[in-house]
Each structure stands twice: as structure tokens, then as C-alpha cells.
Amino acid sequence: MKKIILIIFISINFISISFAKIVEEVKKVPVTVTNANGVSDSREIVVTIWREDSRVKSPYLFFNHGRQSHPALRKQFDRVRYSAQSKYWVQQGFVVIIPTRVGYGESGVDIDPEDSGSCKTISDFPGQVMPQVQQTKQVLEFALKQLTYVDTTQGILVGQSYGGLGAIKIASIADEIKGLKGVVNFSGGGHGRPTQLGQFGAGTSCDSKGLEKIFAEWSKNKVPTLWFYSSNDKFFGPSDPKDWHASFKNAGGTGEFINMPEWRNDGHGTIGDIPNWKPHFDKFLKITGVPFKEIAPPESIKTKPTGFARLDDISKVPSLGSNVNNQERRDRLEDMYKKFLLFPDPTNRAFLLHSSGSYWYWWGGVDAVQEVIDKCLAKYDTGCKLYAVNSDVVW
């Protein structure tokens, strides 16, 4: 049977989606991590699984997320889903496995085993990525033993940002990871400084030379690697990643560097640019020998201004469902919309209303529009409608 995922966008931006062939599951997996100082901790972490509902045995795609160093931001860390990418990879034939690691969101923030210190301290990148490596091994061991629909003989590991840094480390010990055939690094690195000015400047790592050294040390990769970086990466800039890859290659590493086009206002989220990385990703899969289905990438959700209202005219935000004739709920809706207007990045934010009166907003990350749509569709099958995207009302 041909497996499809159908997305229909009606002209007025109401969204109806059928995910009958794609299943999202949440598992709790016990892990033990040891940080760079030798301190150990054992607990359960949240793991998201994306798969086809037919439970056909499929190769795995293991995904490691990036990092937030501030405790408040780590606490706010949602369960990691990467829904647009995950659904695409499931369509390609993978079971997608995404742990939310110790130190983040639902997996517990009372400790931070990946603490990399400040720019004033000496970086210990090997010690700091070890908790990521440990959890990768343990979660994958769980998946290969407990999930009967996972092909234990072949899989790919993908990492984004700090997860990309760890991915290159894992490539150097791939013989310890069952079935691992290739590693993909999206925007990998550490100690990025997207907004701070000073000695190192904004948009660079404050330990770029340290990363050059460590990538050289990890160059004895046992499987092929693929590196994606965008020219407008606000964490690492356009030149540092090229130096890291050159250091890796000069020390004997094998892997292709893809210089991605600019991605919105911050190329650190270039993993969201599926149409542009897809050809390189597919070519890489052929090199690894892992079987996959060649399919078209999902189209970006397109929106356009409607002239319904000015963006800052809060009075025009519609009251729907339970918000009608309920001043208390109307006040809460307006308060949330005010927060949306205050978001610092006007090029990647979205506000969505549901016909029941529920609402969602999001800013930053890979794709704010996709995030609010996913949040709505996780609760409702229909009735989700975008109100504002970036600096425009699209209602």
C-alpha cells in the first residue's frame, strides 16, 4: 500500500491534515549519565518516536537536539519533536528516535550534565559531549531491543547545533553504535555567541580554535559524515565552521561540507530548509547504503497579508468559541497576543486561533508557523487558523 501524508491548505488558511499513516509515540527510557567532573545521575528521560503505523521493520534515524545553557530556558524546553523533519524522514522510510536529554524540559533540569562553562573557562568539549554520547547509546540500545519495528542493522544519526557537535564525536566511535552507517551534522559547534559583542565578536564561537582542535581529534571517523552550515548562522558565522571542517579533513576525516543559503534571519536553523538540504541528504544516504524512498520535500507553508487588520490592533483579534461573550477569556487572549507582539524576532513568529477559542503562539526555533500548527493539530483535527505571521495579519 502506498503510504501518504496529505496536507490540505484551504484558501482562508484553515488547516486540515491527515496523519493516518504516521504515528508519534512518547516513551520513558532509563539512562545514566556522567558529566565531565565524574558526577553520575540516573533517571528516566522522554523519547519521541515517529514511525509508520504499519510497523514495518525500518532503519532508524536517531536525532540529537541542541543546547540551552540558561536554567530558565532549559526548564522551558519542550519535548523535542522536529515534526516537519521527522514526518519527512518517516515518509523516506525511517523510524525516527528523538531523546529530550537530561537537563532539558520534561527530562529534568535540576542538573546540567552538558554544562560547558563560560567563555572565560577552558573548554572541555570531549567531557561535555559525553553525556550526549552516553544517552545516545542507551536510548538506541533500548530502541533496538524493545521496538520490534526498528531494523537493528542499519541507521543514521543526525545532530543539530550542540547535537551536531556530538554527532561528529559519535562518528569517531561508530563501531560502538549498532548498525550506524552515517552521521549528519546540522550547524554543529559550541560556545556560540549570537548577540554578545566583545573580544570575539557576535556570530562566532568564543572557542573556535578549541573546536578546530577537537574536530581534528575526532577525525578518525568510522562512517561517512555530512556537514550543513548556513552563511548567516548567528551563532558561529560564515567562516568558523569552514575552519572546523578543514581541520577535520586535514587530520584525515572524511565528510562533505555543504554551504547552505541564508535561512531566514538566522541560519543556525538551516535544518528547517528541507528543500535545499534534501538533495545532499539523499545523495549521502546512497553513499551509506541505507535504503530510503525518494520523495518530494514538504512545501513551506505559504501565507500572505490579508489586510484584515493592523498587526498591533489587538481589538481586531477575533473572539472564537469559548471566548465569545466571556470577558475574562477575552482578556487572557489579548494578554497573550501582546506577548506575541513583544517577541524580539519579527521574522519567525506566529499566532494561531482555533474555532473552539484556544490559541497558540510561538517565536524562534526552526519554524514558528509549523510549531503553532503542530500544537493545534495535536489537539484538534480541524479548525486551526493562522492569525498573524511575522509582521503580517493573515486572517
Description of each model-found segment:
Residues 250-306:
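C-terminal catalytic histidine-bearing segment of alpha/beta-hydrolase fold enzymes
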Residues 21-55:
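N-terminal cap/lid segment of alpha/beta-hydrolase-fold proteins
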Residues 182, 188-251:
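The feature captures the conserved acid-bearing segment of alpha/beta-hydrolase catalytic domains
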Residues 297-395:
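Secreted/extracellular ectodomain signature
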